[in-house]
Amino acid sequence: MTLNERIAELRERVRQQRPLIHHITNFVVMNDTANVTLHIGGLPVMAHDRAEVAEMVTAAGALVLNVGTLSPDWIEAMLIAGRRANELGIPIVLDPVGAGATSLRTASNRRLLEELQIAVVRGNSGEIGALAGMGGVVKGVETVVEVDDPTAAAKALAQQYRTVVAVTGRQDVVTDGKRVFLVDNGHEWLKTLTGTGCSATTVIAAFAAVEREYPFAAAAALACFGLAAELAAPAARGPASFKVAFYDAIYHLSADQIRAGARVTAVAG
């Protein structure tokens, strides 16, 4: 089976199994990430109260922790849900939104990485560079200075916390500290919408819920996400029409389209 055939098969598994994805995520993207979860084939739940997260996560296939609109109560809820997910072997996908922009964000993300076993960290170059201690400058939640070598930063962070790191950008990099996947799918229109990185994190979680080879799951998810953007682009007249076409493309993404269009390369570590 070729790599693209494996990606297509994994995408169909998500559709068939319909994993519940528990999100503790930010206010900006809740609606969008819930819809993307549905369109890729999963079931979303947005539950962040400390009183219920440990119970809610028991039914989940994966847990998304997104610190975009963080607060002390939400960080505590993330830790409660994360500890329970670790007990049950449920994968956690961390989106370290704005790491490096403020000391609170950087410290909160490091606390989550230190106290929980995270399956996948998905961030932009600046966020991953900041957490790895290798530079990168984040203004708000956007990278304004990229790290010189995103692959090296991703490997360093993956090795430090025994996790998988996915750096999204012009070329996506996924690594567990040894193996590396490069993903070349995507489109410039993605930059015109807020929350596309958070939505990519959601797709990674849906794939990780049904595939425990997390480096491959993350790379496959990013390939499908980027390919959907490519397929949507010809219908776009602006950001709003692109968003509608993009959601439709995620929903309709077929095995034939993936086999023909996914651009993922496995490289030596």
From Swiss-Prot:
Q: Name one GO molecular function term.
A: hydroxyethylthiazole kinase activity
The record ties this protein, via CDD domains, to: THZ_kinase (cd01170)
User: Do the record's keywords include Kinase?
Assistant: yes
Q: Which residues are in coiled coils?
A: none
Q: Which InterPro entries match?
A: Hyethyz_kinase, Ribokinase-like
Q: List the disulfide bonds.
A: none
- At which positions is substrate bound? M46, G195
Any one Gene Ontology BP term: thiamine diphosphate biosynthetic process
Catalytic activity entry: 5-(2-hydroxyethyl)-4-methylthiazole + ATP = 4-methyl-5-(2-phosphooxyethyl)-thiazole + ADP + H(+)
> What keywords were assigned to this record?
ATP-binding, Kinase, Magnesium, Metal-binding, Nucleotide-binding, Thiamine biosynthesis, Transferase
Record-linked Gene3D superfamilies: 3.40.1190.20
Function comment = Catalyzes the phosphorylation of the hydroxyl group of 4-methyl-5-beta-hydroxyethylthiazole (THZ).
Q: What is this protein called?
A: Hydroxyethylthiazole kinase
